[in-house]
Design a protein with these regions (language model features):
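Short loop/turn motifs at secondary-structure junctions
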Residues: 38, 79, 127, 160-161
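Glycine-rich beta-alpha junction loops
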Residues: 48, 138, 168-171
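Short, glycine-/small-residue-rich phosphate/pyrophosphate-handling segment
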Residues: 110-160
Length: 209
């Protein structure tokens, strides 16, 4: 690769360092760096962010009316070549702190008033980022509903989901993801960094998840 280093942004919804989700995201970041890229691992539980208040159309020409730790997240997502979202499954969806972060990204494809007076959701940047979801849950539970939330979020921030890496386990041990799963996560990070950007989608026309 030539030019500026490509950036992988890992959004971590796990409450615990050393958890399977945390380890998988660390591995994805390692793979991205080994491929010559940069990686930023953002832990949602460490952020101080306010909840979305549904402020409506034309709220601000910037991102959000609030200025908190989300300002850094917006800047990273705008620069990102690839995005990996990781979360355990809590009540069929992502963890609460990650959901706060996701909701606050509504302003990346905000509701705006168009020249003819109608309103529509218009993305602030093109959908060129490749993306993936990593998760961990019991073998007795499903993760597809959490994946659906993540895929919708990725579309909203100019990224396209390409795969899910799921560690479904029967134990209750912290960080039990096996070496084979960690190797797959490293390969995921490498692939995302080495892959070319997606062809830009025409602004204002959101394609399917």
């Amino acid at each position: 690769m030539t030019g500026p280093k490509r950036l992988l942004v890992a959004l971590d919804g796990s409450a615990l360092e050393g958890s399977s989700v945390h380890k998988l995201l660390v591995a994805a970041c390692d793979g991205a760096r080994a491929a010559g890229g940069d990686a930023e691992h953002v832990r949602a539980y460490a952020l101080a962010i306010k909840p979305c208040i549904a402020c409506g159309p034309d709220a601000t020409p910037g991102y959000c009316i609030f200025h908190d730790d989300m300002d850094r997240v917006y800047a990273l997502l705008e620069r990102a070549h690839a995005v990996v979202v990781g979360s355990p499954v809590y009540f069929d969806t992502v963890s609460g702190p990650l959901k706060l972060l996701i909701d606050r990204c509504n302003c990346i494809t905000p509701l705006v008033t168009l020249g003819d007076g109608s309103q529509d959701c218009v993305p602030k940047w093109a959908r060129t980022r490749r993306a993936a979801f990593v998760t961990a849950c019991s073998t007795e539970h499903r993760y597809d509903l959490a994946e659906r939330s993540v895929r919708g979020f990725l579309k909203w921030v100019g990224a396209k989901w390409e795969e899910t890496l799921a560690w479904q386990h029967a134990d209750n041990d912290l960080g039990s993801a096996p070496a084979e799963m960690l190797a797959r996560a490293r390969e995921l990070g490498r692939r995302l960094i080495e892959s070319a950007p997606l062809e830009a989608v025409v602004p204002g026309k959101l394609e399917a998840r």
